[in-house]
A protein has these predicted regions:
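Intrinsically disordered, low-complexity regions enriched for glutamine and histidine
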Residues: 1, 17-18
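Short, Lys/Arg-enriched, disordered terminal segments
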Residues: 1-4, 400
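Sec-dependent N-terminal signal peptides
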Residues: 3-14
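Noncatalytic, solvent-exposed loop/strand surfaces
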Residues: 18-400
Length: 400
């Protein structure tokens, strides 16, 4: 009985810990698990609780841990990490080095938080590890100098993946294509040559429930599966567009891996076989091609929007059948909570949409009137609050 009690306590503790930490798209799926959120919004939108207007340039989303909010931005050509409390009070601001200022300027990859450490991958190609409490830089790596990588057209962009003691990064070098570093000191644990592709703006995904637990990601010309323990390349699938850009983290469920990118390439569904050591194509469809907005899986359906195809789509997970196309709302990023889609248009509107394969069932929408430049940062939901970043402004809305 005592053992059962302690096991239950451990499970509860782990569950609470997971709920209290938000990384890229929550857990990289874009699916949130809040209860009691509003099912419709007032005409002018939900109540704005607070906003902060001095983030500088950038497109990164918020990360949250232990009731503190972390986000990056660029002023001049210097990147800064901002730390807020849940009421929007700025607690700390710390520079971390040069950021991307050559095109679509600003901070890019969302902060990853693990064991009191913060991991930031800059648009200039540095992986930086900071102490979560002091914000001191503990170590950093340069993908060009340390791994033979190259920067890419709009600055490298991914949110580092932490698995146990490893932090995973797409370095993009010929020899050091995907690397696993010790998250404490940055030392190299393993390296994978992959296919020698450059990186392609994709934040990698960890797939734990195969015979060979693995990392799945999209590089410039291939979708890639890598043994998480050893770095051995398990499989690759040729998948390229004319820009070599694949910014959307794949979606995995029950041996199926869904990958998509913009510039007209569309989407492909792969099946992992032989315990994850190989893949086969199940179906492919050209219409669902989000460029930076990603997609979500709810039930047996995938929801997202297009790049060349300026529609919102619903596609059957199993068959690739298109259930609807809708052009009534501008395309952009999507996240989900329960059976509702939160769609953030590149035109600067936020919509609440019922997730149903029957139609794009928009319940409410409101304009995002603060901020600067592109509407590209992905929204975040945490403890009944909807966080929206637009350039130099972070906004918090009451969603519950």
């Amino acid at each position: 009985m005592k053992q059962l009690f302690f096991l239950t306590l451990i499970c509860i503790t782990l569950s609470l810990s997971a709920q209290n930490t938000i990384q890229w798209r929550n857990d990289r799926t874009g699916i949130y698990h809040e209860k009691g959120l509003l099912t419709s919004w007032p005409t002018k939108g939900p109540q704005m609780l607070w906003h902060y207007d001095s983030l500088g340039e950038g497109h990164s989303s918020v990360a949250i841990d232990a009731n503190k909010i972390y986000i990056t931005g660029m002023t001049g050509n210097t990147g800064y990490l901002y730390v807020f409390d849940m009421a929007g009070k700025l607690l700390k601001k710390k520079d971390y080095g040069k950021e991307w200022d050559e095109s679509y300027n600003g901070a890019r990859g969302t902060v990853t938080i693990s064991d009191s450490k913060l991991y930031i991958f800059t648009g200039t190609g540095f992986l930086i590890c900071m102490d979560q409490n002091t914000l001191n830089i503990l170590w950093k790596k340069d993908i060009v100098v340390d791994f033979g990588g190259k920067n890419i057209r709009w600055g490298v962009n991914e949110s580092p993946l932490v698995i146990g003691e490893k932090v995973i990064l797409s370095a993009g070098g010929k020899e050091h294509n995907i690397v696993a570093l010790n998250k404490k000191d940055g030392s190299l644990i393993w390296t994978c040559a992959g296919n020698g592709d450059l990186s392609s703006y994709c934040s990698p995904l960890y797939i734990a429930n195969q015979q060979v637990p693995q990392i799945a990601t999209m590089m410039a010309d291939h979708i890639l599966g890598v043994d998480a323990a050893t770095g051995k390349k398990l499989w690759s699938f040729k998948y390229a567009n004319n820009r070599k850009i694949h910014p959307n983290t794949p979606i995995y469920h029950d041996n199926m891996l869904f990958c998509t990118s913009g510039y007209g390439k569309g989407a492909v569904m792969l099946r992992l076989t032989n315990g994850g050591r190989s893949v086969e194509k199940v179906w492919e469809v050209a219409d669902l091609d989000p460029r930076t907005g990603a997609m979500v899986k709810i039930g047996n359906y995938i929801y997202g929007s297009g790049d060349n195809h300026k529609y919102w789509f619903c596609i059957d997970w199993k068959t690739g059948e298109i259930k609807y196309k809708d052009k009534s709302f501008g395309v952009g990023a999507v996240i989900a909570n329960e059976d509702m889609l939160y769609c953030y248009s590149e035109k600067g509107e936020m919509a609440l949409v019922k997730a149903t394969p029957e139609k794009f069932d928009m319940i409410s929408k409101f304009p995002i009137v603060l901020g600067t430049d592109q509407h590209w940062a992905h929204p975040v939901i945490y403890q009944g609050v909807l966080y929206v970043r637009h350039g130099n402004t972070l906004m918090a809305y009451k969603a519950k």
